[in-house]
Amino acid sequence: MTTASSFEKDELLKCGHGEMFGAGNAQLPVGNMLMMDRITHISTEGGVYGKGEIIAELDINPDLWFFECHFPGDPVMPGCLGLDAMWQLVGFFLGWKGNKGRGRALGSGEVKFTGQILPTAKKVTFHINLKRVIERKLVMGIADGSVKVDGREIYTAKDLRVGLFTSTDNF
């Protein structure tokens, strides 16, 4: 298990290039698909369910790539990117705990969007509460997540599921 409890952007990019958890193990996306600038807190303790939590942030500015194309004249961050950020964090948690394999999102339960992220926002905060971590032949994290923009909760997702797979050939 990696013992650090927070990570800056350069460390997240190293994770994306397979330099944090080892080749063939959990990676974050790089470039435009990395949906966070930092992880401010990660722990196997705490959270709503007492099974661990992760808090991460994304700085918002009007020049972010998605505002230009979604939608011209009505810029808003796509909600699916916030959902993907939550999956990214569950996968990161599994790798951070020392589990092996490549991460894949496996689904979620109920997802609710009750607000939006506009170019005028300053900061998005992602909060993941682990509900269950299975560490057997199958490695899977199940978590609830929320997204806040400038302190106001705007998305929630129940039962986010991410697995780590030593082979994705038959996936």
Curated annotation (Swiss-Prot):
Superkingdom of origin organism: Bacteria
Pathway(s): Lipid metabolism; fatty acid biosynthesis
Pfam families reported in the protein's UniProt record: FabA
Major subcellular site: cytoplasm
Known role: Necessary for the introduction of cis unsaturation into fatty acids. Catalyzes the dehydration of (3R)-3-hydroxydecanoyl-ACP to E-(2)-decenoyl-ACP and then its isomerization to Z-(3)-decenoyl-ACP. Can catalyze the dehydratase reaction for beta-hydroxyacyl-ACPs with saturated chain lengths up to 16:0, being most active on intermediate chain length.
Family of the protein in this entry: Belongs to the thioester dehydratase family. FabA subfamily.
Protein name, UniProt field: 3-hydroxydecanoyl-[acyl-carrier-protein] dehydratase
Lineage: Bacteria, Pseudomonadati, Pseudomonadota, Gammaproteobacteria, Oceanospirillales
